[in-house]
Amino acid sequence: MKADIHPTYAETTVLCGCGNTFQTRSTKDGGRIVVEVCSQCHPFYTGKQKILDSGGRVARFEKRYGKRKAGAEKAESADK
């Protein structure tokens, strides 16, 4: 391997939006990574279903297209 071409692989602290912190290793400078969700608060791991709205995107989508049921559109097109 060539010398001085690989980034340093150092201990890094990951800080989640829920307040959970854990240690890992990364090549990112600064020693700190901030994330919105982690395994402690992600709905897949916790079993809780909630909408994670990043910047109002879900609200903007619902405003534009309205709240629709998944099977309602298919049933209407089948009746025609």
UniProtKB/Swiss-Prot annotation:
Put simply, this protein is called Large ribosomal subunit protein bL31
Protein role: Binds the 23S rRNA.
What the entry lists under NCBIfam families is as follows: L31 (TIGR00105), PRK00019.1 (NF000612), PRK00528.1 (NF001809)
Q: Which PROSITE patterns match?
A: RIBOSOMAL_L31
The record, for InterPro entries, names:
Ribosomal_bL28/bL31-like_sf, Ribosomal_bL31, Ribosomal_bL31_A, Ribosomal_bL31_sf
On the tree of life, the source organism's domain of life is Bacteria
Gene Ontology terms, cellular component aspect? Answer: ribonucleoprotein complex; ribosome
PANTHER family documented for this protein: 50S RIBOSOMAL PROTEIN L31, CHLOROPLASTIC (PTHR33280), LARGE RIBOSOMAL SUBUNIT PROTEIN BL31C (PTHR33280:SF1)
The stretch of residues making up the signal peptide is none
Per the entry, which co-factors are needed? Answer: Zn(2+)
The primary gene name is: rpmE
Q: How is the cofactor bound?
A: Binds 1 zinc ion per subunit.
The UniProt subunit note reads as follows: Part of the 50S ribosomal subunit.
